[in-house]
A protein has these predicted regions:
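Alpha-helical segment of the N-proximal tetratricopeptide repeat
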Residues: 40-71
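Residue-level recognition of tetratricopeptide repeat
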Residues: 41, 75, 109, 143-144
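TPR/TPR-like (Sel1-like) alpha-helical repeat modules
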Residues: 118-145
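Structural marker of alpha-solenoid helical repeat scaffolds
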Residues: 71, 105, 138-142
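Canonical tetratricopeptide repeat
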Residues: 81, 115, 149-153
Length: 162
């Protein structure tokens, strides 16, 4: 193969690889799984709830999240943030309700799978956490923070609990 053809082929491979690697990033952007991640929405109640969560004021964040939920009851991200806030307040039943609703709406929701897994660990159910780790493994083709965080939490749990 001549040098110009080889260079052209290498360029094509690099472009294809770059496109292939950008697909998971584009897909992940739709899933607002972290309470600290900036939302694409301009909803002032959701923005205020996120600020409150970042400052650990979970109780007050609930007020704003419930307002958003009234307007958008099928928003998996809002259910995830409600579950997160309730979990941080040790209100386990309410946390499960909202995590499960987020997962009903969007079974592959990264944050809800991570956080419900962490909640299962808190309740001494590592096998249930492993189920959600498997979902994250399937969803995160090239790895993601949610998978890494839950995997580490399971590892820590097993180290401390045999």
């Amino acid at each position: 193969m001549t040098q110009p053809k080889l260079a052209f082929l290498a360029l094509g491979v690099l472009l294809a690889l770059g496109l292939f690697c950008s697909i998971p990033v584009a897909l992940a952007e739709d899933d607002d799984s972290s309470p600290s991640r900036v939302s694409k929405t301009t909803d002032p109640d959701l923005q205020q709830a996120r600020r409150l969560i970042r400052s650990y004021n979970y109780e007050k964040a609930l007020t704003y999240l419930k307002r958003v939920l009234q307007r958008d009851p099928d928003n998996a991200d809002v259910h995830n943030l409600l579950g997160y806030s309730y979990r941080k307040l040790d209100r386990v039943d309410e946390a499960f309700t909202h995590y499960n609703e987020a997962l009903r709406i969007k079974p592959g929701h990264l944050g809800a799978n991570e956080y419900i897994g962490e909640l299962y660990l808190k309740l001494g159910k590592p096998e249930k956490a492993e189920e959600h780790l498997k979902v994250l493994d399937d969803e995160c083709l090239f790895g993601c923070d949610e998978y890494d965080d839950l995997k580490q939490a399971i590892k820590d749990y097993r180290r401390h609990n045999g």
